[in-house]
Amino acid sequence: MLPAPYNAYRITVVNKKGISIEELVPNILRTDIGDASRLWGDIRYNGTPWVQNMSKPYRITNGLQHRHLFIWASHGRYFAGDVWKWQRPYLFATTEDLLTQSIVYPFLMPMLENAGAIVCSPRERDYQTNEAVVDNDMPQRMGQYVEVSQSGATWTASADSVGFLPPTHLLADSVMPFRSGTYRMVQTTSRRSRLATATWTPNIPQSGRYAVYVSYASRPNSVPDAHYTVFHKGGRTSFTVNQQMGGSTWLYLGTFEFEAGSSTQGRVVLTNHSNYRGVVTADGVRFGGGMAQTVREQSGTSGVPRYLEAARYYAQWAGLPDTLFNTSVGMNDYADDLRVRSNMLNYLAGGSVYVPNKPGMRIPFELALALHSDAGFHSDHSIFGSLSICTTQDAEGNAFYGSGLSRRASLDFSSQLINNLTADLSAVFQTQWVRRENWDRNYAETRMPAVPSAILEMFSHQNFTDMKYGHDPVFKFTLARSVYKTILQFVNFEHGIKTYTVQPLPVHHFAAQLSADGKKVRLSWKPRTDALEPTAEPMEYIVYTKTGNDDFDNGTSVGNATACDVTISPNKVYALSLIHISEPTRPRL
């Protein structure tokens, strides 16, 4: 208490941007009404999502269903001077360029997708170094493209058809793959027989797991439910794609096991079946991440798999206009790479309800997150810790996004990221994880996005103790799970949804016992309690079966049991996998 006469004064504490300390408290932690300008309010996307997996035996309803997120791992191989090099130095058996993606790709992205989200990245996500691209303009190259037409439904190319063309040489900056070819289209039908089809059958270079990407054109009369089926070693998996958005880029469907060579068990089929009158379009289909293609002067390509390269080069491969990926006109790939991550997000999301003031591909991305590791060290071997970053004013000083949402929504997001991460890592690893700061500063990755965004400096790649944790797969899982939970919490709260369900932890004591007659195997398991998340309670289990050299199937629900019987045949090798979800199965509508 201050003495008189100062005890009658009201004291206000502000930061250097004039924001009061009360305003720095995230909405979710407030006991009052909060700042409504940081919430989406009536702004929401209620349409068909960009892509849906129709073969899953369950449907998410209390997670991130139909939410579109833009996520990326920090840096990658880039060209500077006259050499290709990493953007960050070698330290403790790695470099940041390699380290951050070892958390984002195998852990964070699957967690978000398992919760129902559609996740996109400005960098290649597939570790597969082989690649097969099948396209209508070169129907016999790297596989086979075949069309089947029906009466009243003939595949054609429009007069203004501009689409993908597989490059026959390395990619110079002047090569625009999605502006060099054509696409095909056909009228839709509501009947389910005698369908027109387009089939892409690749010549798979080597047996293994390949990401499958499709591309198409978005026309004024495109439909929101184009039907694709991926045939793979585990059977077939069906998808619907909303072709009203996202034309002329790569859309990730999933990663599947394929046998080397060409066969009907390895292909993608698109039909003209739809519940809507209009057209479906067909363009290139890509199998696998592949190797670097971008060439630089006398130095050739980077020589690394595409997933190790910077976003600047993938953006060109993914159809971004050269004015957005080549912003320095070939003079500074590093600066291009910093800008292109946000440029790609804004281009893809432009024209959607969340980015109504920019032209683009109308994909309703509503959140962006860049995951980095930081520099800095302590000589006493203590933890250096985590840092989050946001930007509450853009380059012109605007405090609101084009949608009308306050940029302080990003402040809330970055605050929740660092708060939750500190609490989760401290609890799980029984230490005091260091919460550094939540910066509101001018960084391209948080200044340029047209939707709420943050940078998370997860830990220091320069600090020995941090890296003892950073190389631990359990730590990577725990860190990614904390980020997933924060995104789940933040995205729902922004739309006024205060209840959500966290996906459960993996089961333990998973066992298999053969029956006496050898015709069945008894699977049993125990659920794992998550002391940090009361909603992460298993409600249903899905069993996946792999027979012989095939891949896992699409799964079968066994309800909320802790044991089940699986029928088997003699002289066959089986592999069985189990996942659980925290919501009971609901039929697809």
Protein language model annotation of sequence segments:
Residues 188, 267, 273, 284-290, ...:
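Active-site-adjacent mobile loop/cap segments within catalytic or ligand-binding domains
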